[in-house]
Design a protein with these regions (language model features):
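Outer-membrane beta-barrel porins/channels
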Residues: 27-44, 85-93, 98-415
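Transmembrane beta-strand segments of Gram-negative outer membrane beta-barrel proteins
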Residues: 32-47, 65-82
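Outer-membrane beta-barrel pore proteins
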Residues: 48-70, 106-113, 125
Length: 415
């Protein structure tokens, strides 16, 4: 006989499973978003920490030292996910939802050595939704994560070889997660909504130790969020609070000019997802610990290589390939977005309309490797009385466009 969770079980379940079990996002491992630069995405972000594009400052603020005049760059990414779950005893369901992810950058030199920059990005996000009456409804129906990160930065060119950069991150984080309170058809939802603001920093350096070669290293700090919100079930609405720390990220990039037309690039990226180990969840009124949440993530890695070729002074083509190690495995993979390891294939094009205006276009395909297993059984901290097992399939297409503009005069009359 299958045990059917009551509403009281759903209160515990929504906290244990949904409250900050923020599902993995196929775009960048865990619930991170890597789509921050159309030029970078055209080569699977190979070499971004060692590059020149303004949007590469997301990975390394020292990139700003390459800016020679006031610049702005806007990026738009459209995400088309094909993500399915095939439960052992039910029909296959599609849970992917498309999304639009924008980013904006600006920078202006203060003098021959210092450059001031600013970025508005969305480092974390998620949008998945399963059908109302699916086999795993008590473990997840709808998942939404939204973030905005404001990042003022300053770079300093020490000499012709070394540049450094530093920045301040102010980040808003919001989540909305739902799951059924019972296994019966049309069971009502339990819903968690919570948000918070956290502060962090970023650092970086670029070295140009030999002709045509650049090495870049960037660091984005972890950011602690005190999330406050409400848990709503058929029994009513209660205050809820929990702490979540988004992971630190380190990006190492290299670029080498082979001649006037050819360049090769590479990236190694590490994300400290393993710091999301056990998350205590609190009653928002009494402050007592309701439970602890073992996310059990491991650190994520990305390895990518790419190349660029200048067809002319106006047109540059690029391509790249990457391999990503996801932060979850067959034990910790979740129904909200079941992410396996992935191969990333990218291609892109830049068209310089004029000396001041450049258009970047890119397309990226993330291909999940194998059918990732999702298993929730007795003894699992997520278990709500109903054993669940499924295999998953993931295939995500991202189309990116970017517009770069340079200006001879600075805004506000600055000289």
């Amino acid at each position: 006989m299958i045990f059917r969770p009551t509403v009281s079980h759903a209160w515990r379940g929504i906290f244990i499973l949904a409250c900050l079990t923020i599902a993995p996002d196929a775009r960048a491992g865990g619930f991170g978003i890597r789509a921050q630069s159309a030029e970078g995405f055209g080569a699977a972000i190979a070499g971004v920490a060692a590059g020149n594009a303004l949007s590469f400052s997301y990975w390394n603020p020292a990139v700003l030292a390459n800016v020679d005049r006031f610049q702005v760059e806007g990026v738009s990414n459209v995400i088309f996910p094909a993500i399915s779950l095939d439960p052992a005893a039910s029909n296959t369901v599609d849970i992917g939802k498309g999304a639009l992810v924008p980013a904006m950058y600006m920078a202006m030199p203060l003098n021959s050595r210092m450059t001031l920059g600013m970025s508005i990005t969305s480092p974390y996000g998620l949008a998945t939704q399963a059908p109302t009456n699916w086999a795993g409804q008590i473990y997840g129906r709808k998942s939404e994560i939204f973030s905005i990160n404001a990042n003022p930065m300053l770079s300093y060119r020490v000499n012709d070889v070394l540049s450094v950069g530093v920045g301040l991150q102010v980040q808003y984080f919001k989540t909305k997660l739902t799951q059924a309170v019972d296994v019966v058809p049309f069971a009502p939802d339990a819903m968690l909504k919570a948000d918070g603001v956290g502060v962090g920093f970023n650092l970086g350096m670029q070295l140009k130790p030999w002709a045509g070669g650049t090495i870049g290293l960037g660091y984005r700090s972890a950011i602690s969020h005190d999330l406050d919100g409400h848990l709503t079930t058929p029994l009513g609405r209660a205050s809820a609070a929990a702490g979540l720390t988004t992971p630190a990220l380190v990006s190492l990039g290299v670029r080498q000019e082979l001649n006037e037309r050819y360049r090769v690039m590479g990236t190694v990226e590490w994300t400290n997802w393993s710091r999301l180990g056990t998350v205590p969840v609190y009653d928002g009124v009494s402050g007592g610990v309701l439970t602890t949440l073992p996310l059990r993530y491991r650190d994520g890695w990305l390895f990518s290589v790419g190349g660029e070729y200048d067809f002319s002074q106006k047109v540059t083509a690029r391509a790249g390939v990457g391999y990503e190690i996801a932060p979850m495995n067959d034990v910790t993979r979740d129904v909200r977005l079941p992410e396996p390891n992935q191969v990333i294939l990218s291609a892109g094009l830049s068209y310089r309309y004029s000396e001041r205006t450049t258009l970047d276009l890119a397309i990226t395909q993330s291909l999940g490797l194998g059918n990732g297993a999702v298993t929730i059984a007795s003894g699992d901290p997520r278990y709500l009385g109903l054993p669940f097992s499924a295999t998953s399939d993931l295939n995500v297409t991202i189309v990116s466009a970017g517009l770069k503009m340079k200006f001879d005069s600075l805004p506000f009359g600055i000289r």
